[in-house]
UniProtKB/Swiss-Prot annotation:
<feature type="binding site">
    <location>
        <position position="482"/>
    </location>
    <ligand>
        <name>FAD</name>
    </ligand>
</feature>
<keyword id="KW-0472">Membrane</keyword>
<feature type="binding site">
    <location>
        <begin position="307"/>
        <end position="310"/>
    </location>
    <ligand>
        <name>NAD(+) 1</name>
    </ligand>
</feature>
<dbReference type="GO" id="GO:0016651">
    <property type="term" value="F:oxidoreductase activity, acting on NAD(P)H"/>
</dbReference>
<feature type="modified residue" description="Phosphothreonine">
    <location>
        <position position="520"/>
    </location>
</feature>
<feature type="region of interest" description="FAD-dependent oxidoreductase">
    <location>
        <begin position="133"/>
        <end position="482"/>
    </location>
</feature>
<feature type="modified residue" description="Phosphoserine">
    <location>
        <position position="523"/>
    </location>
</feature>
<dbReference type="GO" id="GO:1902065">
    <property type="term" value="P:response to L-glutamate"/>
</dbReference>
<dbReference type="GO" id="GO:0006915">
    <property type="term" value="P:apoptotic process"/>
</dbReference>
<protein>
    <recommendedName>
        <fullName>Apoptosis-inducing factor 1, mitochondrial</fullName>
        <ecNumber>1.6.99.-</ecNumber>
    </recommendedName>
</protein>
<dbReference type="GO" id="GO:0048471">
    <property type="term" value="C:perinuclear region of cytoplasm"/>
</dbReference>
<feature type="binding site">
    <location>
        <position position="398"/>
    </location>
    <ligand>
        <name>NAD(+) 1</name>
    </ligand>
</feature>
<keyword id="KW-0597">Phosphoprotein</keyword>
<dbReference type="GO" id="GO:0043525">
    <property type="term" value="P:positive regulation of neuron apoptotic process"/>
</dbReference>
<feature type="modified residue" description="Phosphoserine">
    <location>
        <position position="115"/>
    </location>
</feature>
<dbReference type="GO" id="GO:0005737">
    <property type="term" value="C:cytoplasm"/>
</dbReference>
<feature type="binding site">
    <location>
        <position position="195"/>
    </location>
    <ligand>
        <name>NAD(+) 2</name>
    </ligand>
</feature>
Amino acid sequence: MFRCGGLAGAFKQKLVPLVRSVCVQRPKQRNRLPGNLFQQWRVPLELQMARQMASSGPSGGKMDNSVLVLIVGLSTIGAGAYAYKTIKEDQKRYNERIMGLGLSPEEKQRRAIASAAEGGSVPPIRVPSHVPFLLIGGGTAAFAAARSIRARDPGARVLIVSEDPELPYMRPPLSKELWFSDDPNVTKTLQFRQWNGKERSIYFQPPSFYVSAQDLPHIENGGVAVLTGKKVVHLDVRGNMVKLNDGSQITFEKCLIATGGTPRSLSAIDRAGAEVKSRTTLFRKIGDFRALEKISREVKSITVIGGGFLGSELACALGRKSQASGIEVIQLFPEKGNMGKILPEYLSNWTMEKVKREGVKVMPNAIVQSVGVSGGKLLIKLKDGRKVETDHIVTAVGLEPNVELAKTGGLEIDSDFGGFRVNAELQARSNIWVAGDAACFYDIKLGRRRVEHHDHAVVSGRLAGENMTGAAKPYWHQSMFWSDLGPDVGYEAIGLVDSSLPTVGVFAKATAQDNPKSATEQSGTGIRSESETESEASEITIPPSDPAVPQVPVEGEDYGKGVIFYLRDKVVVGIVLWNVFNRMPIARKIIKDGEQHEDLNEVAKLFNIHED
């Protein structure tokens, strides 16, 4: 006899409940009376009664033939209607289950939500009452921690509770690659083509990677489950328990807080009316990307407020798009130039000119005083008297760390940097860790810090996961961050990069290979932190040389590629690699060593910027 496996087994399991006993097996008791045949065939009670009435009249006499015919006819019609209804219902359930076999968990969830919107009901998700590892937040840090926990403990059961309706995904492409896609369905697929031509999804893993939350406690080899659209509203540190916004309670053994941050708004917008707020995007999530992409096809002008990484990336992306659509893109910020808080002034000004060439009207030294509505347009009034009319506003002015759980959990908030205050091992309590944007940690090289970048989320999440499984390691691996202003200009940075610090820049003429596009082609990934290898810079030697006065870059030069060193007490504490790629391990080693250097021109040679 053949055995059905794989898909056949799935079909069998799905369709077994639909099988009906339309044929009666031979009874084991041969002396059973035939009068039970109707019960065996599951004929409705009213039809059985009709049959009995048809076989005998009052007081056991024979019925009139016309009455008999009427009863038999009605019985036949009723039986036919019943059979028709039964077959149609079975066919409907059959089709639904056949279609359900090929649906992903994401699609099933989407259809369930759509059914609820149309008046249907969504079965409640069973929340496990206890998990060994609980991760609060569904971003990069939480996912990195989950992978790290499972790597050290392959049987671990990990539950991620995420307020976001999406499965864990990477944020950088939301302001970079997705905007350069020529796929008209990019907002649905969320697939992007990297500069090297390879396709990639912004999701870290497909739905099949995860297990269901209700099955998590019973799976023999453990796994990672995600509760989407759920928020932890109460944390009991002593009782190892959290409460969700739906009233559910979960106890845990180890807990990670990776709640990230919320985009900051402007007080001028907060004071404005409802119409201004409805025409303002606080850019952060997938939903914000989808909304802004749609808006960019419908309006005539968009103003980006903010001159940092996110604001400049979005301005460049929208500016490049405007070359085909004709939309006006304006960027305004209080600094003198783009990324003025990070880059030295000469490089910030050069970057601003680059952004202008992308089709953006850049307005530096702009402080927003008020926002209102005038003639169907949003009217932005600046402190110096200038006015800007626009159809839509995008604010990119930083994050406010999500620290609401500090109150119920009795956790400390850092008064200088914000975020949960943790030690070098990212611990807030003996069984509580914090990672990502919400963590204010002690860097054993650079002091107390709070960092809001993708690679830091990866590094801190991974470290927290290791320490949750007993590693007891301090935060020593310096995370990096990067920013691309289109395919031609990009930079990578590490450490303390603050334009208020003394800087030394060493530059060289760029070649056709010195751009983000070429870097991606060589590394195979647009998420450049993924291409790093520490072993490349395990040993570096800086040759001795006579002290030299570093050359000060001249305003107006073409800064094709170079290295900018940030100094504190003559020690390099931060490095920006300008159109220099795949050299981050060297920069990390220099900062880790923490030595004074007499001639930074010699140090710059380690990055091979003068090679053709």
